[in-house]
């Protein structure tokens, strides 16, 4: 089967200029990818631990609301930030968060510049690429379309133009046809910055976008945009924290245990409930790796 043509983000820049006001508004709310910023979190269960007694881990992520975003002070915050900060404190570590180019995450881990990466990161299908801590939450990779679109099922994506964030599971699924229910699409736009996905759909530059369902629901709520999310998911995944494949320190094992404790003692449910009205879909990880 012929693979869909893959277009990098630059190919849509001219078209996206039409939606520049929309894009600028999004960028202003999301914050900048330049430099590092530390997160200021209060009220976590492990906050009693003396900060000076904790070893520091360098943690990288890109912006992926509500899991990772910057607040009005420029601090890196979000659901994944709260979860990881709590879990690391339980095993004697504290995170130093920095925003990264998501496409460079593997080389940053391999070089030792980062200890781990996170940010709604699907471990399903990548089990042999990293050392994983998790899964700590469940998620669905889904397709979203305009409410008036004639796309109702995955089969309706045939000969359509779809946008994804580069190096994500939707990109892999659509490029390599790893889901037998997904037909041959016409073209796949791969953006290095996920903030371009939503304007591309809203402005009619693509027929559909694919991403974590949770991020799409958050965008709807925050910006008053309405999607129609297809009932059939591309993939059901477990979210994890990734360490370099050659990292032998064992932090991933300890962190996995901390995540399991947080699931068992109700901490995970409490944190997820701060961001989503119904936390139950995120806590149902039966069958996920």
Predicted feature locations:
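Bilobed "Venus flytrap"/periplasmic-binding protein-like clamshell domains
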Residues: 58, 62-66, 74-89, 121, ...
């Amino acid at each position: 089967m012929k693979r869909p043509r893959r277009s990098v983000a630059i190919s849509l820049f001219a078209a996206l200029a039409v939606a520049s006001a929309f894009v600028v508004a999004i960028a202003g709310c999301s914050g900048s990818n330049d430099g590092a910023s530390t997160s200021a979190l209060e009220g976590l269960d492990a906050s009693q631990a003396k900060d000076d007694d904790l070893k520091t881990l360098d943690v990288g992520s890109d912006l992926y609301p509500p899991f990772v975003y910057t607040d009005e002070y420029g601090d890196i915050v979000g659901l994944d930030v709260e979860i990881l900060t709590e879990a690391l404190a339980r095993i004697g570590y504290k995170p130093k968060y920095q925003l990264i180019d998501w496409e460079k995450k593997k080389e940053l881990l391999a070089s030792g510049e980062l200890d781990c990466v996170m940010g709604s990161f699907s471990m399903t299908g990548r089990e042999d690429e990293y050392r994983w801590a998790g899964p700590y939450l469940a998620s669905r990779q889904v397709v979203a379309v305009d409410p008036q679109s004639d796309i109702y099922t995955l089969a309706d994506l045939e000969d359509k133009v779809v946008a994804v964030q580069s190096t994500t599971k939707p990109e892999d699924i659509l490029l390599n046809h790893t889901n037998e229910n997904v037909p041959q699409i016409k073209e796949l736009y791969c953006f290095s910055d996920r903030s371009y996905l939503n304007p591309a759909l809203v402005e009619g530059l693509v027929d559909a976008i694919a991403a974590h369902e949770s991020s799409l629901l958050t965008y709807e709520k925050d910006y008053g945009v309405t999607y129609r999310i297809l009932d059939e998911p591309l993939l059901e995944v477990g979210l994890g924290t990734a360490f370099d494949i050659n990292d032998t320190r064992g932090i991933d094992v300890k962190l996995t245990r901390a995540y399991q404790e947080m699931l068992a003692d109700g901490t995970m449910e409490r944190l997820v409930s701060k961001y989503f009205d119904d936390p139950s879909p995120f806590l149902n990880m039966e069958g996920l790796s």
